[in-house]
Amino acid sequence: SAPAFFDPELIRRFDVPGPRYTSYPTADRFLTALSSPEVADHLSRRANGPEQRPLSLYVHIPFCNTICFYCACNKIITKDRTVSERYLAYLEREMDAVLAALGTGRLVSQMHWGGGTPTFLQAAEISRLMAAIRTRFSLQEGGEYSIEIDPRKV
């Protein structure tokens, strides 16, 4: 086979530190300065706007059993399994609040579970969360669905 060819100029051009990819959209696209009325207004405009595009959901499960020293994610390191029960109840309340503005049964074409480590949840808790999502949203067949896992726990 032919020897590999590397363009030295191309290597010099891209041999610089770049942004660390962690998620899409990236964290700088999220706003923390929105008030509850502003969020409600945004959701209302989304629900009643001319385009009824499918939704994309991000479900954040912040818990991890141990810290990964390379990780820059928003996380809570704990061995206390009881924290997830209360957190799931809050996720269900948040879904209900969002759907109060959007309406139930909205089509979801993309969903990602991130963390933390979503597989911190026990099997029954994962089932509970999926059931909560399925009763509130309509998951598009053939949609894009993903979950971050700790391979040591699967």
Locate each region found by the language model.
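Glycine-rich anion/phosphate-binding loops
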Residues: 82-92, 151-154
